[in-house]
Structure formats: C-alpha cells, structure tokens
Amino acid sequence: MVSELEILQRFYQIYLEQESDFFSFQGNFYYLCKVNNFTNDYPYYVNALGLNGFMVVNNCFNRPISMDYILYTYQIEDYHFEMFLQYSLRPLDIQVEVLKIKESWCAILDEAKCKIGNYASRISHFEHFVVLSYYYQGLGEAAISVLNEIKETKLVAGIEHFNMIDNYEMLCCPANLVIASRIKDLASSYKNNLISVEQLEQYIQISALTVDEIIYLYSRLLFPSEFMQLAINDDCNDAQIKKTLLNMYQNIDNQKASLVIAWQMLNKYTRLPKIAWL
C-alpha cells in the first residue's frame, strides 16, 4: 500500500518527515484526505456559507485526484460558528431511516461492550474507567429506548459534521462533513457547551423542528458518542486517553445537570421519558 508520504512526494513534490493530514509546507497550509461521498458537494457547501474553504491542489499531472486522495490548501478565514449550525439545520431533499440509526447505535454499544470487557480485565486500568463504562452503557441504552418513541420511519437530513468543534479547520474540513439527520450538529453543539439551553430552544423554534425531531434530539443528547469512540478506536491504556477519561469522570455531575436542563426544556414541546437515575 502506498503511504500518504509517498503520494505527496510522487504527485506533488512535497517532502515531509512524518505523516499528518493537516500540515504546512513552504509557508502554506495543506490538508490531505481520501475522496469521500461529500467531495463533489464540498465547493457548493463552502460557497453557500460565503467562504473560500479548502481549495483543491492539482497534482503534477494537472489532475485533482491522486490514487483516491485529494490535496487541499487553505487559509484561516474569519467566520461565525452560528452560520455553520444554522446551515446544518436546513432540510435537504433527503431522509434518513430511524431504523438504521437504531441499528447503528446498537452495533456501537455491542462493539464497545466487547472492547470494554477486554480493558476491564487489565490490572493497569483504573476504577474510573469501570464507572464510566457502566454509566455510558446505561446512557446508550436509554438513548435507544427514547429513539423507540419516534413514530415516523424517516427523519429529514442536513449537512452535518462528524465532529462539531468551534475551529475553522474542523468546521471546513472536507472529510468532516456528512449527510445525516439535521439534528446531529445541534445536539453536538449543546453537548460540547458551544450553545446554551436558551440558544438550543431558539434553534428549535427557528427551525420548526417536528415532535419526532425533538425526540431524536433528546436521544442524541443522551447517546455517549465520544466515550464509545474512545472505547472502540483508542488504546485506553494510553496516558493521554486516560487523562481524557479522567476528565470525563470528573465531569459526570455537570453532564447529568446539563441533560436534566435540556430534558426540562424539551419536555415543554412533547412528553419525553425521564431517566430516573440522572
């Protein structure tokens, strides 16, 4: 398999010492990623936001794609986080199936449970990880239970982010965009403390979310994507990961309070099941 370093050398005459998706070379910022389902739509997306975004660099053969990879260059632009969130709530003429969301979440919980079982058997793991695993497994199961309250079989889609972070490089990253339920970015923004509960309610009203979308919003707030991603994809024995897990453990009470506040607000729009142990 050809490495990213070899692709950069062979097709762009860029020479780096180590692989990195984001990098600088001769005073310019670059990003290298594989072609994805959103590649063709990306220019229209950033144009709609009034930004230049990431721009394609043609290779030495004057072609945009090099062995299924695309190289972009970019400059940090002034932006407002709210414009990304507002755009994510614009409905597309596409729908996502609720059943597929449920199946995906069940698969994530099952895989994480398996990995957590392996980690928990290691003496080197500290007790915080065990507490977190029980807590987040419970949240995940509660989220799926709430998901079952949705009556429609499909939800309206929007242009969302895999990781919703208030950072230009992540918000405009061509590989960080996905067609998903238009609720995804809204839920992530609240969970990541990027918006307050008052702002969350304003977006609900402005976007005229349906009852089913509000139910799904609550289930997304409950589902512990960040912890499950760590449990599945990362080595939880790693010192940096342990530090992240410890921070999660220390923040559990704040997270519970945030979920209760959101539940109280959302419950004004539709009756939502209360999680007794929150």
Predicted regions and their residues:
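A glycine-centered beta->alpha junction motif in the catalytic cores
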Residues: 61-78, 89, 111-122, 223-247
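Active-site Asp-x-Gly
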Residues: 168-215
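ATP-binding pocket architecture of kinase catalytic cores
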Residues: 27-99
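ATP-dependent phospho-/nucleotidyl transfer catalytic cores
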Residues: 10, 14-21, 97-160, 202, ...
